[in-house]
């Protein structure tokens, strides 16, 4: 905050312009679906980052990992022993009557018990600084590519932040994603092929599909 307070209005505008130029050069966009047409828009970028301390992030990251494990245990139970249904914790009719429930998966047991390999949890922070999860996106979570590219743009616009402060990296996400997916391969290949399936260039998340495929 003190760093940005020390910048003049002209300096802030110049850095904002540099960030917008970087977004155009990097081709960062998303598709807005409107009636009758699809519109590609440049990614909106806030140059002032939301700061989370290492201590806070340690608690948040551990909580999210625990939450993802719990969600996988829930899915595994639903398709196997169904104890959570028998105990009445979750109404059976809601689960078994859902269009998303796949009876073909009953009795299945994926490697490492990983039904949901990626979880996109939407976090909010209240006025007391407490974090809450709004929802968990397990089927086709998207948005991580914008996080990685936001960091790259921030490095270009305000490189001083990365010289003067210890900031955790995020650019290794595609590699970690590949390693996780490769570990799930049923084949004993040294470097299994991992692909990203995409509906195509007109899909709203196509930028991310291409970004992750190239990064892996």
For the regions a protein language model found, what residue spans apply to each?
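Preference for protein termini
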Residues: 1-216
């Amino acid at each position: 905050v003190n760093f940005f307070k020390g910048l003049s209005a002209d300096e802030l505008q110049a850095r904002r312009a540099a960030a917008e130029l970087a977004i155009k050069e990097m081709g960062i966009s998303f598709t807005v679906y409107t009636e009758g047409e699809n519109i590609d828009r440049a990614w909106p970028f806030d140059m002032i980052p939301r700061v989370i301390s290492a201590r806070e992030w340690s608690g948040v990251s551990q909580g999210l990992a625990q939450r993802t494990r719990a969600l996988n245990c829930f899915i595994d139970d639903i398709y196997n022993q169904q104890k959570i249904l028998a105990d009445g914790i979750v109404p059976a009719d809601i689960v078994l009557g859902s269009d998303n429930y796949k009876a073909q998966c009953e009795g299945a047991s994926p490697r490492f018990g990983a039904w949901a390999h990626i979880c996109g949890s939407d976090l909010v922070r209240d006025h007391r600084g407490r974090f809450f999860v709004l929802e968990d996106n397990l089927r086709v979570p998207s948005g991580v590519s914008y996080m990685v590219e936001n960091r790259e743009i921030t490095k270009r616009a305000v490189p001083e932040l990365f010289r003067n402060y210890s900031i955790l990296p995020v650019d290794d996400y595609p590699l970690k994603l590949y390693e996780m997916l490769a570990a799930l391969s049923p084949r004993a290949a040294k470097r299994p092929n991992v692909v990203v399936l995409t509906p195509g260039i007109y899909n709203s998340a196509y930028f991310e599909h291409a970004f992750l495929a190239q990064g892996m």
